[in-house]
């Protein structure tokens, strides 16, 4: 297989990502490395939540849940016995009076699970059923009130388009829009961003990247500093203050479901990030009394060899690593399958991509 090309600056970032990866130690018990739930899965869309959950599992999550509509549960269960599937999402067909529902009451079975979860992925296969979306909105509000980090993709982003206040100012969530979703979000927030045609018209690649970065920064700022991964030929990652460009090469085949590898990977990385900040293991780093606020603060933490990182820095690293792993999965799968590549082929590449880009923390290597 053609070797992966990683720039020196990217290698530095991946080395920092390794700091938030929990080592494999005998003292850890089941679930201590994290529990992630994907909220999505409907009659027409059962593959997306499966691919997202499996990416999370293959990256190393201890426990993976799918919270879906009843019509999707048996199908998703049949895909893999490794996933815990909960048919708790109501839909128009499952309630007696869809026009008059108590969304908070319908959300309560899902809300009761939140105390056992470390991160959520909201949107894969969710669909646009009105009852379902109202219930998921209540779950998002409750997750935010408990500071549970979450990823929003696909129809989960539709909820933000309709009500940006759901995430505005929440620094523990990541949005992963594609080109069209990004444009809809920008329009909903009254932001004028350059069209893809305008960006493509730039003859200098650096000018194209600059315009994409500015657009991503603008959208993040309008949402109060929410982290955004703008998916494209290269991924643009921004929290409105600091922006990173993923320079890893991906595969040339585009197929539905590849973004689910991204969301699942992000779910695992968010759970690991929570464990890092909870000091679930001794990272060997020096305490850092200063919380990173500015771009200079974040860059200083990234350049530091042995200083604990702030949440703002680790959230950017989570987004960076999720993007990088997904692009490497795509590259590997495309090299192996070419035009026949399917979303499931990316799932098979998650572990090797992790080892190639990030690698096991030093404490794990002594036990492997």
From Swiss-Prot:
(6S)-NADPHX binds at residues 125, 178-184, 260. It is found in: Cytoplasm. Its EC number is 4.2.1.93. It catalyses: (6S)-NADHX + ATP = ADP + phosphate + NADH + H(+); (6S)-NADPHX + ATP = ADP + phosphate + NADPH + H(+). GO terms for cellular component: cytoplasm. Residues 13-357 form the YjeF C-terminal domain. The keyword Lyase applies. ATP binds at residues 231-235, 250-259. One of its GO terms (biological process) is nicotinamide nucleotide metabolic process. Keywords: ATP-binding, Cytoplasm, Lyase, NAD, NADP, Nucleotide-binding, Phosphoprotein. GO terms for molecular function: ATP binding; ATP-dependent NAD(P)H-hydrate dehydratase activity. InterPro entries: Carbohydrate_kinase_pred_CS, CARKD, Ribokinase-like. Gene3D superfamilies: 3.40.1190.20. Catalyzes the dehydration of the S-form of NAD(P)HX at the expense of ATP, which is converted to ADP. Together with NAD(P)HX epimerase, which catalyzes the epimerization of the S- and R-forms, the enzyme allows the repair of both epimers of NAD(P)HX, a damaged form of NAD(P)H that is a result of enzymatic or heat-dependent hydration. NCBIfam families: yjeF_cterm. Belongs to the NnrD/CARKD family. This is ATP-dependent (S)-NAD(P)H-hydrate dehydratase.
């Amino acid at each position: 297989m053609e070797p992966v090309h990683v720039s020196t600056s990217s290698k530095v970032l991946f080395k920092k990502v390794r700091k938030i990866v929990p080592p494999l130690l005998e003292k850890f018990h089941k679930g201590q490395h994290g529990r992630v739930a994907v909220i999505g899965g409907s009659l027409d869309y059962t593959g997306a939540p499966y691919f997202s959950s499996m990416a999370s599992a293959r990256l190393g999550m201890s426990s993976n849940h799918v919270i879906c509509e009843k019509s999707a549960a048996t199908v998703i269960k049949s895909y893999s016995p490794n996933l815990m599937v909960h048919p708790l999402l109501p839909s128009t067909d499952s309630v007696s009076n869809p026009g008059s529902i108590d969304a908070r009451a319908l959300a309560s079975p899902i809300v009761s699970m939140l105390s056992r979860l470390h991160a959520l992925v909201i949107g894969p296969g969710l669909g646009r059923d009105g009852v379902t979306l109202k219930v998921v909105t209540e779950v998002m509000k409750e997750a935010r009130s408990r500071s549970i980090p979450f990823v929003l993709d696909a129809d989960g982003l539709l909820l933000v388009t309709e009500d940006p206040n759901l995430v505005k100012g929440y620094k523990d969530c990541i949005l992963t829009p594609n080109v069209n979703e990004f444009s809809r979000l920008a329009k909903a927030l009254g932001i004028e961003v350059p069209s893809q045609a305008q960006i493509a018209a730039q003859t200098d690649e650096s000018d194209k990247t600059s315009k994409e970065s500015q657009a991503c920064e603008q959208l993040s700022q309008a949402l109060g500093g929410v982290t955004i991964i703008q998916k494209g030929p290269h991924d643009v990652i921004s929290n409105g203050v600091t922006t990173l460009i993923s320079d890893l090469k991906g595969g040339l085949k585009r197929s539905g479901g590849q973004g689910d590898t991204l969301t699942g990977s992000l779910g695992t990385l968010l759970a690991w990030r929570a464990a890092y900040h909870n000091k679930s293991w001794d990272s060997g780093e020096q305490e850092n009394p200063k919380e990173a606020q500015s771009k200079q603060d974040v860059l200083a933490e990234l350049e530091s060899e042995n200083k604990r990182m702030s949440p703002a820095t680790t959230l950017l690293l989570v987004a960076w690593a999720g993007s990088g792993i997904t692009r490497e999965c795509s590259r590997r799968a495309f090299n192996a399958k070419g035009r026949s590549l399917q979303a499931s082929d990316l799932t098979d590449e998650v572990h090797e991509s992790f080892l190639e880009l990030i690698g096991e923390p030093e404490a794990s290597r002594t036990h492997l």
